Amino acid sequence: MASSKNGTVLFVSLMILLLISTGVKAYCERVRSRSAPHDICKKKNGNAVCKEKCWTIEKYQNGRCLILPKTTKLDCYCYHFDQC
């Protein structure tokens, strides 16, 4: 009987860990802004406008002009956590 409980606890723990790890990854993902103009990052206040668009229109907590490793140009990206 103890072996059955240990197996159940291990299975539930593994499922919780799996759910947390996949949820955090999707929550930290940086997404190209759909509402910000493509040339916004070339302007003096580009980061501020990018953050405002991400916050008010797309409901993300943060937004910033970034060059991601897969891209070669500066674009506005939205994301939830600053530490991602």
Swiss-Prot record:
<keyword id="KW-0964">Secreted</keyword>
<comment type="similarity">
    <text>Belongs to the DEFL family.</text>
</comment>
<keyword id="KW-0611">Plant defense</keyword>
<dbReference type="GO" id="GO:0031640">
    <property type="term" value="P:killing of cells of another organism"/>
</dbReference>
<keyword id="KW-0732">Signal</keyword>
<keyword id="KW-0929">Antimicrobial</keyword>
<feature type="disulfide bond">
    <location>
        <begin position="50"/>
        <end position="76"/>
    </location>
</feature>
<protein>
    <recommendedName>
        <fullName>Putative defensin-like protein 38</fullName>
    </recommendedName>
</protein>
<dbReference type="GO" id="GO:0050832">
    <property type="term" value="P:defense response to fungus"/>
</dbReference>
<dbReference type="GO" id="GO:0005576">
    <property type="term" value="C:extracellular region"/>
</dbReference>
<feature type="disulfide bond">
    <location>
        <begin position="54"/>
        <end position="78"/>
    </location>
</feature>
<keyword id="KW-1015">Disulfide bond</keyword>
<feature type="signal peptide">
    <location>
        <begin position="1"/>
        <end position="26"/>
    </location>
</feature>
<feature type="disulfide bond">
    <location>
        <begin position="28"/>
        <end position="84"/>
    </location>
</feature>
<keyword id="KW-0295">Fungicide</keyword>
<feature type="disulfide bond">
    <location>
        <begin position="41"/>
        <end position="65"/>
    </location>
</feature>
